[in-house]
Curated annotation (Swiss-Prot):
Sequence ranges assigned to domain Urease in this UniProt record: 131-568
Quaternary data: Heterotrimer of UreA (gamma), UreB (beta) and UreC (alpha) subunits. Three heterotrimers associate to form the active enzyme.
Taxonomy, superkingdom: Bacteria
Cofactor or coenzyme needed: Ni cation
The reaction(s) this protein catalyses: urea + 2 H2O + H(+) = hydrogencarbonate + 2 NH4(+)
Protein name: Urease subunit alpha
Gene: ureC
Keyword presence, ATP-binding: no
Signal peptide: none
Pathway: Nitrogen metabolism; urea degradation; CO(2) and NH(3) from urea (urease route): step 1/1
Post-translational modification: Carboxylation allows a single lysine to coordinate two nickel ions.
GO biological process: urea catabolic process
EC number(s) per entry: 3.5.1.5
Family: Belongs to the metallo-dependent hydrolases superfamily. Urease alpha subunit family.
């Protein structure tokens, strides 16, 4: 006889199912379940008197014969490709299957086998996303990594050597010796890491040696001199060795204007950092490049979203980050030229249109490493409130949610040639995953999984009789320590470095894998963020138009995902 449950009772027991809507934190964003891979009446759930017991939902099948190492039950997956309810099987540190878990001897349609060697993680009522990818890291201090993983970031790409003056301003790990030391340091962290070399050179040999040393890309930064000659040389070397180039262009227009920089690209793929320009770049019109097919544009989070406080905080940040002197008029003028309310407002809308493809932090160098995910969803919320639902979205905001989650997951992975390993919740990829309570979505993850093992988690008093007594906060778990962190995280290097056995020569303990497929990319590969509007910027008023339409919006006076969740 069938048993009927109300939707509320079902959701409280097994999590939401097809047609149910879920609010994301305290935003005005709602997502709706599109598909449910589980079977009504045959769901698996762990606990006393529940299903995952021997002879019931747990089979006698050994892991060697197909049972998974970890099953996440009844989770709601939010990814660029869909919003679905499913069980997730993890085996050998990778996502094995998204589907229906259980005991194939007594249950139908089981494609994730639970056995005596299977750990269980309750995903009922939880949202599951891929671990975030931050591709604009100034490696100024190692404590950034703790803050990042606690926020849901599992991959960090950028450059630096610590709190050196160059690193404070530019995301470069310059030269082989510095690159080797940073690769060795990477072994200490439960984080996938990749380092960019310095790309500013008008001759190739100094760039080539950095790629041979392990750089996964090169960074062109105006503080080192981003001229048309250095752009051309850097991209030519990148083309030869299949690594990405990231660029911070010439704010002062000393060596040319934005048109000269675009010409120097010669239609070659390039990742433009802080494409709006407050973080640096041709003033006032670097934002034009987001309409170029070969440009993969990102934002950094201090301008995300546009608020009443955005302009005021930027000037002081900029003076510190770029080693400027407030007593020198030219330095102040340089700083002020980068901060424009009109282009920052337009940036909000260009994200909502899918014309800006990625969001990153610019950590400790005008950006906040722990706020990439928060700022992304705050931008999405602001655009929902100010612009209404996207075409195709109705009572739920599925398209908008998928567009925005792609900005810090799959699109940065594609851009930097690592999407075969990370960036989405898909079978075969490293099991870098975040579980969120819906009320805390995007703000504070409940559990961060690295390579199939819990690395960080909300955890209460370790002396308590149960895990939940206060104070509860994010803490490192066993996946963050000793050999476990090396077995569950990756170090990204160039193919040229692998061919030269650099990881072995340095004694690296993490698996080192090569980036690939970076040089033939176009914006068309940016998932749900591939719009190519024609951008015009008025040089006097800084007004921005896309395909002739003025892009403007009001600054937010209040935001969700803010004081409600934090004491400080």
């Amino acid at each position: 006889m069938p048993y009927r449950m109300s939707r509320q009772a079902y959701a409280e027991t097994y999590g939401p199912t097809v047609g149910d809507r879920i609010r994301l934190a305290d935003t005005e964003l709602f997502i709706q379940v599109e598909q449910d891979f589980t079977t009504y009446g045959d769901e698996v759930k762990f606990g006393g008197g529940k299903v995952i017991r021997d002879g019931m939902g747990q089979s006698p099948i050994a892991n060697a014969d197909g049972a998974v190492d970890l099953v996440i039950t009844n989770a709601l997956i939010l990814d660029w490709w869909g919003i679905v309810k499913a069980d997730i099987g993890i085996k050998d540190g990778k996502i094995f299957k998204i589907g229906k878990a259980g005991n194939p001897y007594i249950q139908d349609h089981v494609d994730i086998i639970i056995g005596p060697g299977t750990e269980a993680l309750a995903g009922e009522g939880m949202i599951l996303t891929a671990g975030g990818i931050d591709t604009h890291i100034h490696f100024i201090c190692p404590q950034q990594i703790e803050v990042a993983i606690a926020s849901g970031i599992t991959t960090m790409i950028g450059g630096g050597t610590g709190p050196a003056t160059g690193t404070n301003a530019t995301t470069c790990t310059p030269g082989p010796w510095n690159m080797y030391r940073m690769l060795q340091a990477a072994d200490a962290f439960p984080m996938n890491l990749g380092f960019l070399g310095k790309g500013n050179a008008s001759q190739p040999q100094g760039l080539t040696e950095q790629i041979f040393a392990g750089a996964i890309g090169l960074k062109l930064h105006e503080d080192w001199g981003t001229t048309p000659a250095t752009i051309d040389t850097c991209l030519s070397v990148a083309d030869e060795y299949d690594v990405q180039v990231a660029i911070h262009t010439d704010t002062l227009n000393e060596a040319g204007f934005v048109e000269d920089t675009i010409a120097a690209f010669k239609n070659r793929a390039i990742h433009t950092y802080h494409t709006e320009g407050a973080g640096g770049g041709h003033a006032p019109d670097i934002i034009k490049v987001c309409g170029q097919a070969n440009v993969l544009p990102s934002s950094t989070n201090p301008t995300r979203p546009y608020t009443v406080n955005t302009l005021d905080e930027h000037l002081d940040m900029l003076m510190v980050c770029h080693h400027l002197d407030p007593a020198i008029a030219e330095d102040v003028a340089f700083a002020e030229s980068r901060i424009r309310r009109e282009t920052i407002a337009a940036e909000d809308i260009l994200h909502d249109l899918g014309a800006f493809s990625m969001i990153a932090s610019d950590s400790q160098a005008m950006g906040r490493v722990g706020e990439v995910i928060i700022r992304t969803w705050q931008t999405s919320h602001k655009m929902k409130v100010q612009r209404g639902s996207l075409a195709g979205d109705g009572k739920a905001d599925n398209l908008r949610a998928k567009r925005y989650v792609a900005k810090y997951t799959i699109n940065p992975a594609i851009t930097h040639g690592i999407s075969q390993y990370v960036g989405s919740v898909e079978a075969g990829k490293l099991a870098d995953l975040c579980l969120w309570r819906p009320g805390f979505f995007g703000v504070k993850p409940e559990i961060v999984i690295k390579g199939g093992m819990i690395a960080w988690s909300q955890m209460g008093d370790a002396n308590a009789s149960i895990p939940t007594p206060q104070p509860v906060h994010m803490r490192p778990m066993f996946g963050s320590f000793a050999g476990a962190r090396n077995a569950t995280s990756l170090t990204f290097v160039s193919q040229a470095a692998l061919e030269r056995d650099i990881p072995q020569q340095l004694g690296l303990r993490k698996s080192a894998v090569a980036v690939s497929g970076t040089r033939q990319l176009t914006k068309q590969e940016m998932k749900l963020n591939d719009a190519l509007p024609h951008i015009e910027v008025d040089p006097e008023t800084y007004e921005v138009r896309a395909d002739g339409e003025l892009l403007t919006c009001e600054p937010a006076t209040v935001l969700p995902m803010a004081q409600r969740y934090f004491l400080f």
